[in-house]
C-alpha cells in the first residue's frame, strides 16, 4: 500500500500522505506532509504534523489514490464509525499552487451535539515562522493576528455576514471546542496569508458565505526557537441548518499559494487570479 506521494510542478514540491505516520499525536496527520520550493527547502509544515488536514478524514485512516503525476487524493468511504463519504484532492499547478477540493456526503446526520450547523474544518500546523500571525483585510486595511493563547480569541468571522447569519454555539459542560471563541474583528475578503522566511503562504477560498478562520499560537507544538511554539493557521466552513441535507454532496475548494513574498498587492492579485481561473464565488 502506498502511504504518500511526492509531486513536483514548477517551483513547488509537495508530499501528500495518509494518516499512517505515528507522529507526536499518533496516526492522524493526513494531508500535505511536506511543502517546499526551489528557493526555500525548509518544510512549511511541522515535520511530524501536516498542512491542509481535513477534519473529516483526520485520524480516520483515509486511503491514498494517485491520480496523476501532479494530483492525488485521500479517500474514505462511509462506515458505522463515521458515516461520511469523503474525497480530498490535492493538485499541484505551476508555478506555485496547490488546488485542494474536499467532496463529502453525509450518510447520516453528523452535526455535533446541540449544533444546528455542520462544521467542516481544516488544520495547518506551521513550521517555526518568525511571525506567527495571519494577515487579512479588516475594514479595508491589513490586519495581523494570532490568538493570545490556545482557545482564546481563536475564531474570526466574515464582515460580509450579519450577526443573525452566524452560528450560535451551544452551551456545553466542561471544555468546549477551542475555536468557539470569536474576536471582534472580522475579515473583509475570503483569504489570508502568513510569512515563512521570505515566502508567503496564502490560502484563498471559495464559498465565502460559510467561511470562518481560526488560529492558535501553539497548535503546531514546540518550535526550534527556544521558548517559542509553532502556530496553527486553520479554517472551516460552517453549513447552516437551511443548507444542510443528509445525502447531498458538498464540494469545498481552496487554493494554496506558496511563493516568495512580493507585496500585499500581490496577495490581492493572486486572489483575483484564483477567482478568474477557478470561478470562486466572491462577496
Model regions and ranges:
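Low-complexity, serine/threonine/proline-enriched polar segments
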Residues: 137-186
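Extracellular structured ligand-interaction cores
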Residues: 59-61, 85-89, 95-101, 117-123, ...
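Beta-strand-rich recognition/accessory modules
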Residues: 3-7, 167-283
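Acidic (Asp/Glu-rich), glycine- and aromatic
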Residues: 97-154, 264
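Short, surface-exposed beta-strand/loop "edge" segments at domain boundaries and coil↔beta transitions
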Residues: 22-25, 35-45, 79-86, 110-113, ...
